Amino acid sequence: MPDAARKYQPYPTVGLTDRTWPNKVIDKAPIWCSVDLRDGNQALIDPMGHERKARMFGLLLDMGFKEIEIGFPSASQTDFDFARWCIEEGNVPADVSLQVLVQCRPELITRTFEALKGATNPIVHFYNSTSELQRRVVFEKDVGGIKRIATDAAKMITDMAAKAGGGYRFEYSPESFTGTELEVALEICNAVTEIVRPKPDNKLIINLPSTVEMSTPNIYADRIEWMCRNLDNRENLIISLHPHNDRGTGIATTELGLMAGADRVEGTLFGNGERTGNVDIVTLALNMYTQGVDPGIDCSDINRMKDVYEYSNQLKIPERHPYVGELVYTAFSGSHQDAINKGMKALKKANTSLWEVPYLPIDPADVGRSYEAIIRINSQSGKGGIAYVLQADYGLNLPRNLQIEFSQAIQAITDAEGKEVPAKRIHERFLETYVDQPGARLKFLDHHTYPDTAVKGRRVIEAVILDKGKEVTISGTGTGPIDGFVDALSRHVGVEMSVLDYSEHSMQRGSNASAISYVEMEYPGGKLFGAGINTNIVAASLEAVTSAANRIVGRKAR
């Protein structure tokens, strides 16, 4: 990589030594504005058609968004037509404002008002880029020229709104605010405010976007607090944030911006947007929810939200995405699973509504997820999750090496079928592989042992087995039944085998409880497990040896 100090320069700080935002907390939800249908849509490889837009729009209404940016109607006929559909057929509640975006160009402003005819309290969101870099290399204008673009647009928009009979709301964005000197951003915003003349019953939205995330979140917060202190007519302004996620800190940037005095947030569901995306409104809302703050939008059916997002955007949500990912409520670490299990049990016993479960900052049920999701198994699952399923639902405590081995069998299923494997199917596959073994060559029936008169301390075992359906008696010697039976089977099948590890446990309580034994066997070329279940612990262990031998013989025969 090139020398960083020669190629890049650090972002300037604000010098706000008396900043107050670090001592603030977020104790109420901001005004939310979804920009999924505009900023999110323009970032898609395959932009939404009408059906995909309509489905997303319906979800946003159901979630309770009161401000929805529906498009850029002057930029395309598709967006214009969708705006008309929303107004004429979208069944928009009276308390919902449709927002549209427009550049500060006369012909585009005219077209925008045509698109908004008949809308109730629509928001006209006009913008122009104000950054030092774009002033210099894109527009080749000084600050006065850039300010004039904004003020000319503000005059035209307010005049057209008045001629249309009023009822319009206005939003102005100094685009690339993060690349604009604070004094310049302030000068332009104040000039726009003077023209719009906002009032208590029709405040002007001043949107201060992190169009490109260029600094740590604390510096953005300083900039927001500085603007809130210095903007004219602040009491009649709504300060809005529009963060992107270029540095991966969009959530933190937004939260600190709210602490710094902002009133409103523009973002998208699950963070779709240009480059690395817009800020994720769902994560923001649920972060507030888990701090005891009503987020003001309904995220109780996160599975539907995910489905609509993936259908409308033709994008997949990562498994580890906060709150919604397939694996966020699933623990694979054995210690994590144990802590969750104990926490859930303790919660049931506690006489409180307070949620306190290790590793789960939110109750999955609050967002429409089931508790089974904590132990669900799919193609991304590991040995820990599979072991947890078998332990929690069927009382099987698999040894670690068996967890690793059996997880490969489940992985084969998920890879082949591409869908979730339910707990019942996992248990059936375990029994089929290690216990019942339909079609296997060998089956243990009975045994007896007696002292080996030739070698002190050793015993002879005589066991009755089925070999390809034929009853056979085999014998061997060893220090105990397992050792002797392994010797007998090795001689019988002609493969040298030995026990590497053995464990057993009861599956239920009581004198007639079944026990399960696990045996790891080594043979020339590898090692494999077997398992046996019986009310007699010795019989269970010999069945486990037989199980492992069947798998070894089957492997050798390939």
From Swiss-Prot:
One of its GO terms (cellular component) is cytoplasm. Pathway: Amino-acid biosynthesis; L-leucine biosynthesis; L-leucine from 3-methyl-2-oxobutanoate: step 1/4. Residues 437-558 are annotated as: Regulatory domain. It is found in: Cytoplasm. It holds the Pfam family IPMS_D2. Mg(2+) binds at D39, H242, H244, N278. One of its GO terms (biological process) is L-leucine biosynthetic process. Residues 30-303 form the Pyruvate carboxyltransferase domain. Keywords: Amino-acid biosynthesis, Branched-chain amino acid biosynthesis, Cytoplasm, Leucine biosynthesis, Magnesium, Metal-binding, Transferase. One of its GO terms (molecular function) is 2-isopropylmalate synthase activity. Its EC number is 2.3.3.13. It catalyses: 3-methyl-2-oxobutanoate + acetyl-CoA + H2O = (2S)-2-isopropylmalate + CoA + H(+). Homodimer. This is 2-isopropylmalate synthase. It comes from Mesorhizobium japonicum (strain LMG 29417 / CECT 9101 / MAFF 303099) (Mesorhizobium loti (strain MAFF 303099)). The lineage of its organism: Bacteria, Pseudomonadati, Pseudomonadota, Alphaproteobacteria, Hyphomicrobiales.
